[in-house]
Design a protein with these regions (language model features):
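Well-ordered alpha/beta subsegment
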Residues: 106-147
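Short secondary-structure transition/capping segments
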Residues: 77-92, 128-139
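Terminal, regulation- and interaction-focused segments at domain boundaries
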Residues: 1-30, 34-36, 132-136, 140-149
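Beta-strand/loop substructures that line and gate deep hydrophobic ligand-binding cavities in soluble
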Residues: 82-109
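Short Gly/charged-rich anion-binding patches and loops
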Residues: 21-22, 39, 72, 122
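Compact, glycine-rich, soluble single-domain proteins
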Residues: 35-82
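A generic structural signal for alpha-helix starts
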Residues: 14-18, 64, 114
Length: 149
């Protein structure tokens, strides 16, 4: 199970704290809610003794989509919210999305599939909308998708 290999990964040309603010603003503009946040700094250290970079998991949902999914199938609620992984890498920040269904290779209940697809699409649009903003007026795109590794 590799969470980072599942979804599209983006790179933000900003330090971690600024990137998190940009991402939160873009999600809010798409009428999405960050219902929870888990600080995972130090959890994924690559080497012992090396300073760990900051990392967070933002739990993102849209109450209307969750309501729709649960109205069609009450079991659908366990697949929400969507996990947005954000981790620092020096002057850059990486962002990736992972849903519970993708993480464990599960087929979503019929009632959850449509709302989850729409939620994922809105999160992707929010992340891509940040690419239109400029970093400090220098004309540098703040976020761009990374290619396959």
């Amino acid at each position: 199970m590799n969470a980072l290999g599942l979804g599209q990964t983006y790179t933000v040309s900003a330090r971690f704290d600024k990137a998190v603010k940009l991402i939160r603003g873009a999600l809010f503009a798409m009428e999405l809610s960050v219902v929870g946040e888990v600080d995972t700094s130090g959890t994924f250290a690559r080497e012992n003794g090396k300073k760990t970079e900051p990392a967070k998991i933002l739990l993102v949902d849209c109450p209307l989509m969750v309501f729709e999914a649960q109205a069609l199938d009450r079991a659908a609620g366990v697949f929400f919210p969507l996990h947005v992984l954000v981790w620092g890498d020096g002057d850059r920040t990486h962002v990736s999305t992972v849903s519970s269904g993708e993480l464990f290779d599960l087929r979503l209940p019929l009632g959850a599939a449509g709302p989850m697809e729409r939620l994922q699409a809105r999160v992707v649009m929010a992340l891509e909308s940040v690419s239109g903003s400029k970093d400090g007026g220098r004309g540098v795109d703040c976020i761009r998708p990374e290619g396959p590794k």
